[in-house]
């Protein structure tokens, strides 16, 4: 008999989870969903079930999602070539139309449907809805390898959050609805901007003073030099690990986004493996969690 088939074990698991459920009751938890988990139907169903259970447990979950691979697939299908500056994609007018169509259209509604299939009320949004988020043009700089001079890149309609209004999200929380948000937002200049989903999630979580911001990735979390999972880090610890090279490569911007979210008012940010089924529940409702927690 497995644990799930054993009533006594089920009762023990629920009893152990109860204090954590009480801890997060009526609290905002923002989950950034993307990466490999999004491309796996079974993991997608497990994620939707986790989000539904959070709501049923009294938590206020907010889902922010990406969709880079799906955007690229649609651009290829439409014969739109991608242009890069300094290794970063330039989002021109045609591209941002596709980005909005894929993110706020197909992907967003797929996630909404999965959560609704679990008996909850999810609603698909983007930054444009209710003037929730206004963007400003993002400015990126690189060092020219030939001249060693800093160069400002024009990435087109790539933006960053400039203003976040939580009014709509508070209304939805009181209405028992689950927001699923695509990282697309208008600028005060009238243009539409594509925003990095991690950055967007951090801004939403900061505006809500969320108890937790969870980043679902394709790695277990932050690893030490022996490749073992670090369960908890302070901001100062994380910065030290960046300086000494323990945190490197693509993990650096992820951790820097976590640090920025904490500075915006988030209580704790977690990097965890979205490929692990029910990793969201394991992180929030078990003693040892499931990833790396970064705190002030």
Swiss-Prot record:
Gene3D superfamilies: Acetylglutamate kinase-like. GO terms for molecular function: acetylglutamate kinase activity; ATP binding. Catalyzes the ATP-dependent phosphorylation of N-acetyl-L-glutamate. This is Acetylglutamate kinase. The record marks 32, 254 as: Transition state stabilizer. It catalyses: N-acetyl-L-glutamate + ATP = N-acetyl-L-glutamyl 5-phosphate + ADP. One of its GO terms (biological process) is arginine biosynthetic process via ornithine. Pathway: Amino-acid biosynthesis; L-arginine biosynthesis; N(2)-acetyl-L-ornithine from L-glutamate: step 2/4. It is an enzyme of class 2 (transferase). Its EC number is 2.7.2.8. Belongs to the acetylglutamate kinase family. ArgB subfamily. The keyword Amino-acid biosynthesis applies. It is found in: Cytoplasm.
